[in-house]
């Protein structure tokens, strides 16, 4: 198997950290759509949103997804990548989609411990835990609809990588 592997999930679920570790374990390349966007626009996510609005950012996010997709590549996507139908369809058609599922409380702890100042504007203006709960209430169904595999990602990256590899091997064997 050398299809791209797309990691989806909420902000703070570990897509980049887990993605880098998974890419090393599989000897795959690694790409991050947010990083690609920053490098190609020379703006942070917050700056893109301020300048172009959320619709402009979402369009650029779709462009990034298509640009980084390549065989034998792990792709960490932005948390809102699943909001556009075409992105969900593209990922499912071109690779294996893994939803890194993490409870709201764990996401809140991670985001409070490692704030991404200037990286990602608040979506609702609410406190972190409340915002995450609101966002997941909308997006969880989209993550699940898009994913080939749902992985419990509340543990250390090495444990999560092991779970993903197990899921990929089981799927490949069947």
Swiss-Prot record:
Its cofactor is Mg(2+). Substrate binds at residues 34, 58, 79, 139. ATP binds at residues 12-17, 120. It holds the Pfam family SKI. InterPro entries: P-loop_NTPase (IPR027417), Shikimate/glucono_kinase (IPR031322), Shikimate_kinase/TSH1 (IPR000623), Shikimate_kinase_2 (IPR027544), Shikimate_kinase_CS (IPR023000). Pathway: Metabolic intermediate biosynthesis; chorismate biosynthesis; chorismate from D-erythrose 4-phosphate and phosphoenolpyruvate: step 5/7. This is Shikimate kinase 2. It comes from Cronobacter sakazakii (strain ATCC BAA-894). The lineage of its organism: Bacteria, Pseudomonadati, Pseudomonadota, Gammaproteobacteria, Enterobacterales. The gene is aroL.
């Amino acid at each position: 198997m050398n299809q791209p592997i797309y990691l989806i999930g909420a902000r703070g679920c570990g897509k980049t950290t887990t993605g880098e570790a998974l890419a090393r374990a599989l000897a795959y390349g690694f790409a991050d759509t947010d990083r690609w966007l920053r490098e190609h626009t020379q703006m942070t996510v917050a700056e893109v949103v301020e300048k172009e609005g959320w619709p402009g950012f979402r369009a650029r996010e779709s462009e990034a997804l298509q640009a980084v997709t390549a065989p034998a590549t792990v792709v960490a996507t932005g948390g809102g990548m699943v909001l556009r139908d075409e992105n969900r369809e593209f990922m499912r058609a071109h690779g294996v989609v893994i939803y890194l599922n993490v409870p709201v409380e764990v996401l809140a702890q991670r985001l409070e411990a490692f704030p991404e100042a200037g990286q990602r504007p608040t979506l609702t203006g609410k406190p972190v835990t409340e915002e995450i709960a609101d966002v997941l209430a909308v997006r969880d169904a989209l993550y699940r609809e898009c994913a080939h595999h749902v992985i419990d990602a509340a543990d250390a990256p090495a444990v999560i990588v092991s779970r993903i590899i197990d899921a990929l091997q089981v799927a490949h064997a069947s």
